[in-house]
Amino acid sequence: YSQRCGFVVYGGWPAAMEISEVSLAGEAGGEAFRLPVRATVLSGGVGSTAATHPYRMMMGRAWTLLKSGNLKQLLLKAKRYRAGKPGTHGDVVAAVRRQLEKNNCSRFMLVLDHDLGGGANNYREGLIRERMADGCGTLLLSFHLLSLQYSLEICTPGGRQRFSISGLDVLISLAEEGLISESFYNNAVSFEHPEDVPDLLVTLRSVYAIPLTLAMHDYYPICPSHFLLDASERYCGVPDIETCSDCLPKIDFWFVSFFESRDIRLWRSKWGACLESADSVLCFSNATRDLLLRAYPDLNTDRIDVVPHATGFFPARKPKLDMSTGLHIGILGEIGPHKGCDIVKALSEEIVTQNAATRISVIGTLEADCDPAVVTETGPYEASGLVDLVEASGANVFLFPSIWPETFSYVVDELMQLDVPIVCFDMGAPAERLRHYPKGKLIPLANARDILSQLKVFHEELARPMVIGE
């Protein structure tokens, strides 16, 4: 792989030719090195194999960050993706036994999670810390994208040790040895052959009686398009299965390509069995529960637990917002494609088209190239500094531009704690929260002109010859 060896080999051949093996051969000594075709061959000039799609996706996002001048953010993302590289090969079962004896534990909890960052990873790390505080350990199964390998990390109070494993069968071996106390599915987005994950969890539950909890951080158990975005990259609303069957093969973004069959009936069959076998399906909002039941109407609701995330942001004071200066849109967070960066870009272009005085302040980062006369960006922030950042920005109405029905939003919670006006699209957990928030407004996901118009109307409703706040 180019990211490890430092060079790239490329070539071409007739499209009709089937490639079964590619090797590098040294001219002098004749040494040969076989290349893994699935991971290296770009066919038809576009890299259409499932294994290469994440690389193309990440390159596209990297180019977007470069164009927008977000070099620091690009470096942070690159560092995150390179982290978590699988460690040494070895006898994992023996290593787990040694750590159990060393920590005086009988069994470890197994956690399945991606390594893509974000709220799901933060939640997982919280679980691991809780186990460590109790003197116990955790087995963390992940899939490392840059090396296309599974890793199993043994996490104990004494440290963390990461192993490279060949596949999911290793977990069956650990179960046979009685080394797993419970399974916790956190997230499997980006896992290779993701349809094998529910089969594994069902086996651990049914054959080895290992209790299972599934956490709904996104909608992966409903669809490989885990944000529920259809082929046109719009929220689908979980339609009938025929519509899904027509849509899924057309989707070419995110990690959908890892599910090579693109058969939504097969996907729902496997994940439906997994959901039925779970002891608890953990939802962080009623909106998530409702969408899950729309996809699986026969699912036993007794096993669904709605438990909102605990939040710890309580500002010492509320920011002062000046409503007399005209509409100034504030946006908080790390705004990538599914978080609405295209919405922000379209809004900025509409502001230019209308020659409006409206400005947009992004407190955080934005993966879009916008007119700097309209859009300013602070870069990453700490919650402790939010009050000062909000006041310094001049923003007086905040837009939450996410285009998918988020299962929970820490950003919305932070904005509510700041007691500022918030606008979001009428979907998911954010809408559920803002529906009962005095300074909240729900709007349909529409074109930039309509969104800007709704924001202006909301600002006019709020505007008075006074300063809101303390």
Task: Walk through the language-model features, giving the residues of each.
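Basic, ligand-binding patches in group-transfer machinery
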Residues: Y1-G69, L76, A94-A95
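A short, glycine/small-residue-rich beta-strand->loop->alpha-helix junction that serves as a flexible
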Residues: Q99-L100, N104-C105, V111-G126, S190-E192, ...
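Membrane-proximal helix-turn-helix segments that form the acceptor-binding/catalytic region
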Residues: S206-V207, G237-S280
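Helix-loop-beta element that forms the nucleotide-linked donor phosphate-binding surface
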Residues: A273-S277, R289-T311
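Conserved donor-binding/catalytic core segment of Leloir-type glycosyltransferases
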Residues: L282, D322-K339, K345-S348
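Nucleotide-activated donor-binding/catalytic signature segment of Leloir-type glycosyltransferases, i.e.
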Residues: G364-G394
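Short alpha-helical segment that forms part of, or immediately flanks, the ligand-binding pocket
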Residues: V387, V412-Q417, A431-E432
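Short hydrophobic beta-strand element within catalytic cores of glycosyltransferases
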Residues: V397-F398, P421-C424
